[in-house]
């Protein structure tokens, strides 16, 4: 049996993909694509180690305890270098999470060919005519290189000890004099690069699950002349004691969004001991939170916010608040509700020592089929 480990690369930003969600976070059923792709390959062989490379490692750990997670780098090569330093098996198979439909037959052919060269590479023949700088070139001399590629670990480690940039493992190994063996590739292993590529993948639609999140925040008062709630400045004889602008309503909303997605909370993402968040406009924090949950495959359904304050009166500002929130969340105005209540002069809120807010949000998976 081959002493073999698996590395799945998925630290890219999906800049060419053209959808709100990173491709690795598109859902097929309840699984994000990175998990689906990793399980698809790892189920076909008893790999010594399975390493997933990502920029969302802590979040990914919630989805599986069977894999190791390594932080990605600036480039594919940096990410691979980070991962392979944790590999001690004789051979390593490297694939891209963007190749989600790798067939079992291709994995088998790679493993059977492992001893033929330093790197085993699936490649497709080109059937169309090819032109380069207005000159037709012989397509029979060209190949489309795919992953996964299977390499001798020591050779790949050696090949990565360079500042030269390579787009795949085989070219790096070839550059140091290593040998490469080509096997027949598979159309099903083509890379998911643009959103239209989704049409050829045999993937289930996202599940119809709904995810509810709840957020709560409170801030005490100090002397001042206004407070900010849901992005609206309200004239008042006090101000919030806070590291940011103290917008309790938007802070609660941020936590509700993050909680529904089971993501890190507002204190972890925007700590109050970080100077870059000093006096920050909380609308920026909310926009960052929205961008995050969308990038990991969620859509926002609705938001319901309750502001708990003895004073000032909130009613005159509710419409302006709702519009700001709806614009940032990217949902219709009728799906945002702002409410206000008092504590009937009870407790610290009743004594006008501060204000609290509670927010509830519902999310669903981004349905990529609707944009094809």
Swiss-Prot record:
InterPro entries linked to this entry: IspD (IPR001228), IspD/F (IPR026596), IspD/TarI (IPR034683), MECDP_synthase (IPR003526), MECDP_synthase_CS (IPR020555), MECDP_synthase_sf (IPR036571), Nucleotide-diphossugar_trans (IPR029044)
Gene3D superfamilies: 2-C-methyl-D-erythritol 2,4-cyclodiphosphate synthase (3.30.1330.50), Spore Coat Polysaccharide Biosynthesis Protein SpsA, Chain A (3.90.550.10)
Stretch list, region 2-C-methyl-D-erythritol 4-phosphate cytidylyltransferase: 1-210
Alphabetically ordered keywords of this record: Isoprene biosynthesis, Lyase, Metal-binding, Multifunctional enzyme, Nucleotidyltransferase, Transferase
GO MF annotation terms: 2-C-methyl-D-erythritol 2,4-cyclodiphosphate synthase activity; 2-C-methyl-D-erythritol 4-phosphate cytidylyltransferase activity; metal ion binding
Positions MEP for the nucleophilic attack (site feature) positions: 139, 191
Record bears the keyword Lyase: yes
Catalytic activity: 2-C-methyl-D-erythritol 4-phosphate + CTP + H(+) = 4-CDP-2-C-methyl-D-erythritol + diphosphate; 4-CDP-2-C-methyl-D-erythritol 2-phosphate = 2-C-methyl-D-erythritol 2,4-cyclic diphosphate + CMP
Binding positions for 4-CDP-2-C-methyl-D-erythritol 2-phosphate per the UniProt entry: 217-219, 243-244, 265-267, 270-274, 341-344, 348, 351
Cofactor(s), names only, from the UniProt record: a divalent metal cation
Region named 2-C-methyl-D-erythritol 2,4-cyclodiphosphate synthase: 211-372
SUPFAM superfamilies according to UniProt: IpsF-like, Nucleotide-diphospho-sugar transferases
BP-aspect Gene Ontology terms: isopentenyl diphosphate biosynthetic process, methylerythritol 4-phosphate pathway; terpenoid biosynthetic process
EC numbers, comma separated: 2.7.7.60, 4.6.1.12
Site feature Transition state stabilizer, where: 16, 23, 243, 342
Binding site for a divalent metal cation: 217, 219, 251
Pathway, per record: Isoprenoid biosynthesis; isopentenyl diphosphate biosynthesis via DXP pathway; isopentenyl diphosphate from 1-deoxy-D-xylulose 5-phosphate: step 2/6; Isoprenoid biosynthesis; isopentenyl diphosphate biosynthesis via DXP pathway; isopentenyl diphosphate from 1-deoxy-D-xylulose 5-phosphate: step 4/6
Family: In the N-terminal section; belongs to the IspD/TarI cytidylyltransferase family. IspD subfamily. In the C-terminal section; belongs to the IspF family.
Function: Bifunctional enzyme that catalyzes the formation of 4-diphosphocytidyl-2-C-methyl-D-erythritol from CTP and 2-C-methyl-D-erythritol 4-phosphate (MEP) (IspD), and catalyzes the conversion of 4-diphosphocytidyl-2-C-methyl-D-erythritol 2-phosphate (CDP-ME2P) to 2-C-methyl-D-erythritol 2,4-cyclodiphosphate (ME-CPP) with a corresponding release of cytidine 5-monophosphate (CMP) (IspF).
Descriptive protein name: Bifunctional enzyme IspD/IspF
Species lineage: Bacteria, Pseudomonadati, Campylobacterota, Epsilonproteobacteria, Campylobacterales
Gene that specifies this protein: ispDF
């Amino acid at each position: 049996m081959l002493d073999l480990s698996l590395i799945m690369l998925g630290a890219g930003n999906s800049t060419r993909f053209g959808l709100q969600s990173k491709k690795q976070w598109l859902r097929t059923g309840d699984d994000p694509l990175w998990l689906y792709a990793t399980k698809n390959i790892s189920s076909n062989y008893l790999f010594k180690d399975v390493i997933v490379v990502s920029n969302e490692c802590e979040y990914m750990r919630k989805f599986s305890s069977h894999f190791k997670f390594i932080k990605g780098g600036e480039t594919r090569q940096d990410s691979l270098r980070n991962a392979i330093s944790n590999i001690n098996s004789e051979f390593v198979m490297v694939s891209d999470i963007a190749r989600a439909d790798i067939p079992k037959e291709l994995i088998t052919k790679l493993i059977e060919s492992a001893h033929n060269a330093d790197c085993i590479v699936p490649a497709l023949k080109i059937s169309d005519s090819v032109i380069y700088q207005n000159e037709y070139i012989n397509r029979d001399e060209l190949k489309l290189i795919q992953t996964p590629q299977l390499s001798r670990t020591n050779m790949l480690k050696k090949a990565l000890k360079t500042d030269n940039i390579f787009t795949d493992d085989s070219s790096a190994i070839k550059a140091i004099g290593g040998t490469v063996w080509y096997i027949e590739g598979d159309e099903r292993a083509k890379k998911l690069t643009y959103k239209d590529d989704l049409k050829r993948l045999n993937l289930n639609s996202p599940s119809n699950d709904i995810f509810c999140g709840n957020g709560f925040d409170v801030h005490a008062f100090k002397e001042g002349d206004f407070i900010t709630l849901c992005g609206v400045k309200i004239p008042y004889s006090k101000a919030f004691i806070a590291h940011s602008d103290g917008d309790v309503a938007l802070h609660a909303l941020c936590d509700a969004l993050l909680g529904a997605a089971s993501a890190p909370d507002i204190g972890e993402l925007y700590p109050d001991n970080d100077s870059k968040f000093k006096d920050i406009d909380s609308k920026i924090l909310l926009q960052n939170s929205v961008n995050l949950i969308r990038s990991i495959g969620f859509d926002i359904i609705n938001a319901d916010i309750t502001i708990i304050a003895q004073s000032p009166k909130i009613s005159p500002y509710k419409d302006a608040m709702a519009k700001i929130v709806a614009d940032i969340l990217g949902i219709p105005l009728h799906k945002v509700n702002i409410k206000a209540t008092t504590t009937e002069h009870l407790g610290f809120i009743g004594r006008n020592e501060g204000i609290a807010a509670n927010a509830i949000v519902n999310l669903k998976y981004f349905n990529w089929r609707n944009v094809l």
